Regions:
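Transmembrane alpha-helix boundary signature
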Residues: 66-78, 96-102, 119-133, 239-242
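Membrane-embedded alpha-helical core segments of multi-pass
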Residues: 88-93, 110-125, 146-156, 172-178, ...
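Membrane interface segments of multi-pass transport proteins and intramembrane proteases
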Residues: 98, 128-138, 321-328
Length: 395
């Protein structure tokens, strides 16, 4: 895709508007959450020690929807209404879940209906494997259930990474950049703009969540479910890309790429749910067995945990990219991503639990690294905290 000034403006202006709107709305949402006592209270499985406002997702989604509306004004050929409507609906569902805790079954049904709405209104489906296993176009009877399964899986995988400060927002910002790069290579300016809008909307929340003290909020289900819907749109848009836009990119494994970007959330979710089922529990029952809980147990700070897991995910993407540059087949690219995903979740987690129990040398090495991730609130950190907290509106 040729970069023109018009294209740059279509990307930068909506993203800037999204960032400013998210910055502006944050203190007002924070005040409402405190006044109405919409907070996440500490308990045995939570990592925080004090109640934290849980409407951060509202600020993020407000920024995203503001950016989408501005893009509709600037981009004459864009039609993001189905995405806009889907995000708005799941935002309401997420807010209800944050306040009254909907049952997993109810949420699951709503997610399926929402995905069906997206399929019917946008036409996006996994209808082409682009040469993976020698398969190109697939039957609509396979495409529809596969798309529903993939989208609901993505929504729940993203929903389950909201465990430590900076993880969900940091991971999704980095992923938006990666998706944006792929959309750019595929010549899809609308999706490049959407990826930029989402990343820009997340930035203010990330700063408050990581550096803020009185301005800190959690993103909540309203945020993670909304991001899950948007990431589903990203994945299906990439996989359903016109083959002509990929004709000059031989052996570009877009399915391995999307799995690489989503690797840690997807494989960690599969691992956790598998363990729960084996133990006779509901796959949706909450516990402290996610990858981020392991890093906290090893003594890592929240930001240290977030950066470590994001770094692991970037390593998977780098391995996929190296496989692509080496000219490996699309099948080989997928197998490499799957093997690494299994190793850093299904193998790494139980291995480290054994190291913790036996207090081995490897355990002490990780603990030493974890201890180094803790920072005192001085210098840059104190400056960032003051900047984040200065917007707080007194009750």
């Amino acid at each position: 895709m040729i970069v023109t000034m018009n294209n740059l403006l279509l990307i930068i202006l909506p993203a800037l508007i999204a960032f400013l709107c998210a910055c502006w709305i944050h203190p007002y949402v924070l005040k409402v959450a405190k006044v109405k006592n919409i907070v996440d209270k500490p308990n045995a499985r939570k990592l925080q020690h004090v109640p934290i406002p849980i409407l951060g997702g509202l600020t993020v989604v407000f920024g995203i929807l503001s950016g989408i509306m501005s893009f509709q004004l600037f981009g004459e050929y864009a039609d993001f209404f189905p995405v806009f409507a889907s995000v708005f609906i799941i935002l309401i569902i997420g807010l209800l879940d944050d306040m009254i805790s909907l049952s997993p079954k109810v949420r699951f049904i709503i997610e399926i209906v929402l995905v069906l709405y997206l399929i019917l209104t946008t036409g996006f489906q996994i209808n082409d494997f682009h040469g993976l296993w020698g398969i190109d176009i697939i039957s609509k009877y396979v495409s529809l259930p596969l798309t529903i399964f993939a989208c609901v899986g993505i929504i729940n995988a993203i929903n389950l990474i909201d465990g430590v400060d900076g993880y969900s927002s940091g991971y999704t910002m980095v992923s938006c950049i990666l998706f944006g790069i792929m959309f750019y290579n595929l010549g899809n300016i609308q999706m490049v703009a959407l990826a930029a809008i989402v990343a820009a909307s997340l930035a203010p929340f990330f700063l408050h969540n990581v550096f803020g003290k009185t301005s800190k909020m959690f993103i909540g289900d309203s945020g993670t479910l909304s991001l899950g819907v948007i990431f589903s749109v990203f994945v299906i848009s990439i996989i359903s890309a016109d083959s002509t836009s990929m004709s000059a990119k031989e052996n570009l494994g877009i399915i391995p790429f999307t799995l690489a970007v989503l690797c840690v959330p997807v494989f960690d979710t599969l691992r956790v749910m598998t363990v729960r089922i084996v133990r006779g529990k509901s796959p949706f029952s909450p516990d402290k067995t996610h990858l981020h809980h392991l890093f906290i147990e090893l003594g890592y700070s929240h930001i240290g945990t977030a950066l470590s897991i994001i770094g692991m995910n970037l390593f998977v993407v780098l391995c996929w990219y190296c496989a692509y540059l080496m000219g490996l087949s699309i099948d080989a690219q997928l197998y490499i991503v799957i093997l690494i995903g299994i190793f850093i979740t299904f193998v790494f987690y139980p291995t480290m639990k054994v190291q913790i129990r036996k207090e081995t040398l490897l355990y002490h090495c990780f603990c030493k690294i974890g201890a180094s991730t803790h920072v005192t609130r001085k210098g840059f950190w104190l400056f960032a905290q003051k900047w984040a907290d200065k917007s707080v509106i007194e009750e």
